[in-house]
Amino acid sequence: LKGVAVNDQAEREAGTRFMPKFDDKGLLCAVVVDHASRAVLMVAFMDAEALAATRATGLAHFHSRSRGKLWQKGESSGHVLEVEEILVDCDQDALVLSCRPAGPTCHTGAPSCFYRRLEGDVLQPVKT
């Protein structure tokens, strides 16, 4: 890894210290799963502010790339995501948020943003 000391890399991969590795835009990938079913609900991005807000409140916050600002999932709909657990990948550049959703997760009203399956070149609905 360019710019990362060997000790930092070893600590990041095998240590116990949380050392989030944000990309060049200051973001981490966050995969949200349902705490009960483990179904994938959505994928979003977190910056340091969103990560801090999530950890402080227990509610999922993300960075809106289109609006360039912090947003709490469900802030207008009431369909918040209560975070039960945060899993960190080996490089500490991606997270899994295990959440209890307070309603549909997708802005379309679907329980999950992953409500279609690719079959050839056609999207087919899946039961979510």
Residue ranges and their predicted role:
Residues G3, N7-L28, V33-L41, M46-T128:
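C-terminal binding/interaction regions
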